[in-house]
Regions:
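Hydrophobic pocket/interface hotspot
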Residues: 20, 30, 55-57, 74, ...
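Short, surface-exposed coil-to-beta transition loops
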Residues: 6-8, 66-71, 90-94
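Hydrophobic ligand-binding cavity/cleft-lining segments
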Residues: 1-40
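Glycine-rich portal/gate segments that line the openings of hydrophobic small-molecule binding cavities
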Residues: 41-84
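A short, structured loop/turn motif at beta-sheet edges
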Residues: 17-18, 49-50, 75-80, 96-105
Length: 140
């Protein structure tokens, strides 16, 4: 049996964990930060944040040349601490939120998929997380 490679991306945000959680989980906010670069956007975001609940977002190139759906089912939700889910293809993702005073560390670990090189996946997920940091710090 092949072992799935786990990849971790992380950042520290200058905002309290309650605000970071709100920005991460509410669809109105997700649509504004969920992209790896300025030429992409997320026109659709839905989120039923509870164990067994589903989430879905649609990421598209702004020029309409490409797009894909991203979604899964929540396995664990601990407010202001942990979100874990299983993607449609069976891969697992866990996000940990560590709040301390007015900063929040966000650590995201995911099972790598087998189509693209791990480095590209890590760069893509880190770029989205960096965009989230920028959005959160600009909107607190």
């Amino acid at each position: 049996m092949e072992t799935t490679k786990k990849v971790t991306v992380e950042t520290t945000i200058q905002a309290p964990v309650e605000k970071v959680w709100e920005f991460w989980t509410e669809p109105t906010h997700i649509k504004k930060w969920n992209s790896a670069s300025d030429d992409w956007h997320t026109p659709i975001a839905e989120n039923d944040l509870r164990v067994g609940g589903e989430f879905r977002s649609r990421m598209e190139a702004k020029d309409g040349s490409f797009g894909f759906d991203f979604g899964g089912i929540y396995d664990e939700v601990k407010n202001y601490e942990v979100i874990a889910y299983t993607l449609g293809d069976g891969r697992k993702v866990k996000i940990t939120f560590k709040g301390k005073e007015d900063t929040t560390e966000v650590i995201e670990t995911f099972d790598a998929e087998e189509t693209n090189p791990v480095e590209f996946q890590q760069q893509g997920w880190q770029a989205i997380l960096d965009n989230f940091k920028k959005y959160a710090e600009t909107n607190i």
